[in-house]
A protein has these predicted regions:
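Compositional signal for N-terminal targeting/processing segments
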Residues: 1-233
């Protein structure tokens, strides 16, 4: 069995993520990270200083959102890593190399698309003025429409940051399932549908735990607003 646990990188999900992992006692826990980003999460400065400009923009944006939830972006990945260690399970870093991915993105993205991305300043692009809570609820109901809009406005960004990474992570899970009967993957909720489609098409047994299932508690601070988030980790 492969279990896909869909998370949000700016929410406090540590306890719930660990609960789902402990419940399944997997032999391997997969993380939506590459080695460099995993070690950056373990370091005090989070390793953003040398990251590409667009990555730093998006990461800083997520930092500001996460402050309202009392967490640091990526805490759910560290929680999953800690749970794996408690279970003596293997840890698999299944995402593509972030540095190479963003280098490709900058190389292949047309100037007009770059201009739209930078000019938007990320926030307020699709749904200006909506609270984080309102936007998350809409995304949870219909990721397909969200990614369709992204694909029209930023086709290169969607292809490289979403579609190609979904394929890469799904292939990694297929290989791991060949040697592990019980696999848990912790990744951004926006990746779940795409990876689920690939895995089910290959006839693999898959179950999902979605972000809306994990978010049983609401944050004390609810004043942050945003219009656009792109899963980058």
């Amino acid at each position: 069995m492969i279990t896909l646990i869909g998370t949000g990188h700016v929410f406090n999900l540590r306890a719930r993520v660990q609960e789902e992992i402990f419940r399944r006692v997997p032999s391997v826990v997969c993380l939506e990270l590459d080695p460099a980003r995993y070690h950056a999460l373990r370091s005090p400065d989070r390793g953003k200083g040398k990251a590409p400009l667009v990555y730093r923009m998006l990461a800083n944006f997520q930092d500001r959102l996460a402050e309202g939830y009392g967490v640091k972006p990526g805490d759910e990945m560290l929680a999953a890593s800690d749970a794996a260690k408690d279970l003596a399970a293997s840890i698999a870093l299944i995402d593509k190399d972030a540095q190479q991915t963003f280098q490709r993105l900058m190389k292949e993205m047309p100037f007009r698309e770059k201009f739209r991305l930078v000019g938007s300043s990320v926030a307020g692009l699709f749904m200006p003025g909506k609270s984080v809570e309102d936007q998350v609820k809409e995304l949870e109901q219909d990721y397909t429409s969200y990614f369709n809009v992204m694909g029209k406005k930023f086709p290169t960004l969607k292809r490289i940051l979403i579609d190609e990474r979904n394929e890469h992570m799904a292939n990694a899970l297929v290989q791991l399932h060949g040697s592990h009967q019980n696999v848990v993957a912790v990744l951004g909720d926006g990746h779940v549908d795409g990876i689920l489609q690939i895995l089910t098409a290959k006839g693999l047994p898959v179950e999902t735990v979605r972000l809306k299932d994990l978010r049983t508690e609401r944050p004390a601070v609810g004043t942050a607003t945003t219009g656009f988030t792109v899963e980058t980790s």
